């Protein structure tokens, strides 16, 4: 950035005065349908969001209102509207305090809700960018970034009219919008469930198929974030969802019916996790036979949804799943080694996840015949160039260690080798010259040198203004501090945490590998990615706690509170304690999450 606002006030004023003319240029290119120049103009404003906040500050409110109107105008090209909505999403994410201070959240929310009605018969599952899908994304960010008074409360007030509308597009839009806002304001929405759930239940029985599909999506999203609260309504929700599933099962040649199948599986997958085992057990005989029929369906999404749901049913129902265990494992085993295509690898990951949940449900003895082939497949998965599948393998090892505890020792060589190789992966050479267009990549995944990298902004700080919302000490929200969070770093976060599960459950069997593991974890304490640091420190403390318990089992006196310490631990335990404490204190001052 060549212009320094603090040092060049005249130049800053000149630039600010040019903004209205720049907006006029954008408007004229949109009105004329000049795609190339319009896209350059949108890109210019996106770029300015990443520059000094002072550049847009004078006209920021007017610019936001212009983009709202542009995104809401149905007479212009959808691509231009989607660009305007994308700009608004970036504004909310990176100028959230400015947006909050303008008190424009309610208008953004209601405009976005109206745009969602344009979804029509298009599936919300599709990935093509449209104004309606962009509006759903805007609602998601609004709910996550702004207070309920500006987003969720006005949304809920408006939903009554949408839910009761004679137009199915409005009913569909209402429940989809509700689902998108749950994650951002779960606590507030939990207080309104007594009014929300009757409406959602009614929409599950709607005369229009797409509305019922949207209602299933809404239930899944509600249950994801409010599992316990939604789970209490299982007696009414599950029968309604099964009714949809059964109706759709009678017409599998229709894509909309397949969407209902997938939606039912996803909704029950999310909902049943919030049930107590005795409640989940009531539904096993109804759910498992229905879903298992889709293990061999040609639609990959249906197959994956059904397999994932059965895993969750097993996890929730525990021993009640045993009567179906042999048949289900026979149906799933054929997918454990598939690897002919990316779709095969995706499905293989879902299957391994579900098998891990099933193992936890039925216990060590019934699952024993399947452990060796599953462990062999999980070790092979590390070399299939599929990051998600590698993470699945690590999580599976964690589950198997919890189920088999010391008996997992026979698989420790392979598991430790895989985890160690993960932590030793090189993260150098992944630096990217993001430049001033980096904002276009924030939140996206890019592939560089065969590695998937998720680009994340390191700060959500907002710009200074006269509002009392900015009294907290904050830096200007410049984009100079954008970092890439690589898939490798995310893998390391999971691997470090899995180490903790394996160590704490295999206990003495892990001692031959302990020194090398602790050494590697200590190296990760100052990793650039917060998730890796937290996992490494957490596992180090779990390791110390496990060794302390083993020392007590060997005759050491139990710990007693007070100073000076009344228990003298073995020298090796003291040494580990000192290392862990020093590692913790070395990052203590700089960590936000202590």
Regions found by a protein language model. Give the residues of each.
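Karyopherin-beta/Importin-beta family HEAT-repeat alpha-solenoid scaffold
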Residues: 1-594
């Amino acid at each position: 950035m060549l212009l320094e606002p603090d040092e060049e006030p005249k130049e800053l004023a000149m630039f600010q005065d040019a903004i209205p003319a720049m907006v006029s240029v954008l408007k004229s290119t949109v009105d004329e349908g000049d795609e190339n120049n319009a896209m350059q103009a949108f890109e210019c404003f996106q770029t300015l969001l990443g520059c000094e906040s002072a550049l847009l500050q004078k006209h920021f409110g007017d610019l936001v209102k212009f983009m709202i109107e542009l995104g809401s105008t149905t007479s212009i090209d959808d691509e231009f509207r989607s660009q305007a909505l994308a700009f608004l999403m970036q504004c909310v994410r990176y100028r959230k305090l400015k947006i909050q201070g303008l008190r424009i959240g309610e208008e953004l929310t209601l405009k976005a809700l109206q745009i969602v009605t344009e979804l029509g018969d298009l599936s919300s599952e599709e990935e093509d960018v449209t104004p309606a899908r962009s509006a759903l994304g805007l609602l998601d960010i609004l709910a996550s970034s702004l207070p309920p008074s500006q987003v969720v409360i006005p949304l809920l007030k408006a939903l009554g009219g949408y839910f009761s509308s004679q137009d199915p597009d409005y009913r569909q839009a209402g429940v989809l919008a509700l689902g998108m806002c749950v994650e951002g304001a779960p606590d507030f929405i939990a207080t309104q469930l007594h009014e929300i759930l009757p409406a959602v239940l009614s929409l599950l029985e709607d005369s229009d198929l797409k509305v019922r599909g949207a209602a299933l999506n809404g239930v899944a999203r509600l249950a994801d974030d409010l599992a316990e609260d939604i789970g209490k309504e299982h007696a009414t929700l599950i029968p309604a969802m099964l009714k949809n599933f059964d109706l759709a099962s009678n017409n599998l040649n229709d894509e909309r019916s397949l969407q209902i199948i997938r939606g039912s599986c996803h909704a029950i997958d999310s909902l049943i996790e919030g049930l107590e085992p005795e409640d989940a057990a009531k539904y096993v005989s109804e759910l498992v036979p229905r879903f298992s029929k889709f293990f061999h369906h040609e639609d990959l999404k249906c197959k994956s949804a059904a397999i994932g749901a059965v895993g969750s049913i097993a996890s929730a129902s525990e021993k009640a799943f045993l009567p179906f265990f042999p048949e289900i494992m026979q149906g799933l085993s054929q997918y454990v080694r598939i690897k002919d295509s990316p779709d095969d690898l995706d499905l293989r990951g879902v299957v391994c996840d579900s098998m891990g949940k099933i193992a936890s449900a039925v216990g060590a003895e019934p699952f024993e015949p399947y452990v060796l082939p599953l462990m062999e497949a999980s070790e092979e998965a590390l070399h299939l160039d599929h990051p998600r599948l590698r993470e699945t393998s690590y999580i599976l090892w964690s589950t198997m260690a919890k189920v088999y505890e010391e008996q997992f020792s026979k698989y420790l060589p392979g598991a430790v080798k895989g985890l160690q190789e993960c932590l030793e992966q090189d993260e150098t050479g992944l630096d990217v010259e993001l430049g001033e267009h980096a904002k276009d990549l924030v939140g996206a995944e890019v592939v560089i040198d065969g590695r998937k990298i998720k680009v994340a902004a390191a700060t959500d700080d907002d710009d200074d203004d006269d509002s009392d919302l900015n009294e907290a000490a904050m830096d200007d929200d410049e984009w100079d501090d954008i970092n890439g969070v690589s898939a490798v770093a995310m893998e390391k976060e999971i691997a470090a945490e899995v180490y903790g599960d394996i160590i704490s459950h295999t206990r003495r069997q892990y001692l031959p590998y302990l020194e090398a593991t602790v050494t590697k974890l200590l190296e990760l304490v100052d990793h650039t990615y917060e998730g890796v640091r937290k996992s490494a420190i957490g596992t180090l403390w779990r390791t110390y706690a496990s060794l302390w318990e083993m020392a007590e089992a060997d005759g050491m006196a139990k710990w007693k509170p007070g100073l000076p310490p009344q228990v003298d631990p073995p020298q090796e335990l003291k040494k580990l304690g000192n290392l862990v404490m020093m590692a913790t204190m070395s990052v203590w001052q700089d960590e936000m999450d202590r």
